[in-house]
Amino acid sequence: MDRIFARFFCFLLIAAVSHAADLSPEQYWRSILPNTPMPSSISQLLNYPYLPAVRLPRRTDAGQRNYKSSVSHVAERSHRVDDGQRNYKLSALPATNELPHRTDAGQRNYKSSVSPVAELPHRVDDGQRNYKLSALPATNELPHRTDAGQRNYKSSVSPMAELSHRVDDGQRNYKLSALPATNELPHHTDAGQRNYKSSVSPVAELPHRVDDGQRNYKLSALPATNELPHRTDAGQRNYKSSVSPVAELPHRVDDGQRNYKLSALPATNELPHRIDAGQRNYKSSVSPMAELPHRADDGQRNYKLSVSPAAELPHRVDDGQRNYKLSVLPATELVHYTDGQRNYKSSVLETPELLKDPDMALFFLEKNLQQGKKINNALHFANLLATTNSKFLPRGKADSIPFSSKELPEILDRFGVRPGSDDAAEMSATLQDCELPANKGEKKACATSLESIVDFVTSSFGASDVDAASTVVLSKAVESSSLAQDYTVSGVRRMAGTGQLIACHPESYPYAVFMCHLTEATTRAYKASLVGKDGTAVEAVAVCHTDTSDWNPEHAAFHVLGVKPGTVPVCHFMQPDAVVWTRRG
């Protein structure tokens, strides 16, 4: 009878395992943990990626994220609208060399093309100034000038040549083209500020004119120059150009802030460099290795674009906090996950950079976890995994992929990661961390699937009646809530269960991998309601370690909090992408 019962039990076990293998990760959760709601840190990772096109952000500090992703060689590159006023659209299609169109406050537009008949950029500043420069070789027409809508200077030195047209009083139009039939250009000095100099014939000197000691026109006839007008307005604007085959078109400095340089060299397609208030710079070229515009806005935003096959798409720094890096390489991108709490035995003597990690702000003293207390740590709660393609793989798929340091070359090849790269180093570090033995009094495992996490939790607790909790940002008052800020505790409650708990932290890897560890019995878990300085509401999970006597005296937490091992409980908040498990009851 016992033998029959044993065989029947084995049959049921095999049937259960076979049935579980047919379940999706979400279904597996519900079958094993029917009374445990799934936290957002887990549910956000249930959409499976198509390997190997997976990527994760590199997190270097709280609120300062670096995102890398890959795009195909024919992909359309980043579209950006800033304050509804600036639009950048750059296409990497090999059939076109069109450079970016830009509208600033609905007033400035840059459009350029490097085809032989292309127009160089049109610019409208404050809806009043228009610059149009044509590279057509069929004309040398130079500007006519009207100042205050009252003065018109027009001269001609050949049947074909016209000089410049100009409208002043904030309504200036420059049109320059380049017939080789004339070299005549005006010299003009207005209040000692404007100067035009050009040449018209081998022998002739044209009249000098002084009007109120302010305007001087001198036209000389040196045959060796094709220099176009130099103009200085209030010591601030300078135009210099040449119509020779290697000539440069005008340079312009407006209030010491804007510079335009356009070259008519047949061998170059370089478009204008622009500096606005010392802050914006555009440089572009569509040669095979050329860079597209660099832009710095208020010293905070930078765009760098290249159309070469290995080029980088724009880097953007917004308020010094977020950095986006997009690569056209198909290689997998990873998250650089820095968690100041993962290794409780870490030493700042061995890794002094830990003290600079913004996650150190997550440490606090348990006595401050009271209603009305202010956490003056400039906290930032960042859910990195929510914006990436790093998802859980079904256990069958995850188990089929090697996961050990010895097999790193095969793993890198599988995910298209170049050996020796930063991503390869991150993956290697994750594998080594997972292979380290657990700390004293702990049990740990690296789970490569959601099913593996569930199995680790239930086997460690010996029960399936558990709670899972993650930090959740409930509301953001304003966009600036992404900044690190002080929070005030509006409520605290102890999480159900006593004794040991399990904490799971995400690791740097192409797909979702969590390091889970069962902590000592001397830990307590809390849920704290926090309100930020700007009104942001956060339901934060906090873990307190009541016995730190065996911690490394050089642990970063002791330096941050100014305490010694074994004296007071050391607590830390959990980031939204981590999970804390407790036994219910």
Curated annotation (Swiss-Prot):
Keyword list (alphabetical) reads: Signal
What sequence ranges are listed for the domain BURP? 363-584
Signal peptide boundaries: 1-20
Record-linked InterPro entries:
BURP (IPR044816), BURP_dom (IPR004873)
Keyword Signal on this protein? yes
Highest taxon of source: Eukaryota
* Presence of the UniProt keyword Signal in the record: yes
Matching SMART domains? BURP
Tissue specificity is: Expressed in leaves.
Q: Which Pfam families match?
A: BURP
Provide the residue span(s) of the region labelled Disordered: 63-82
Report the protein name in the record: BURP domain-containing protein 17
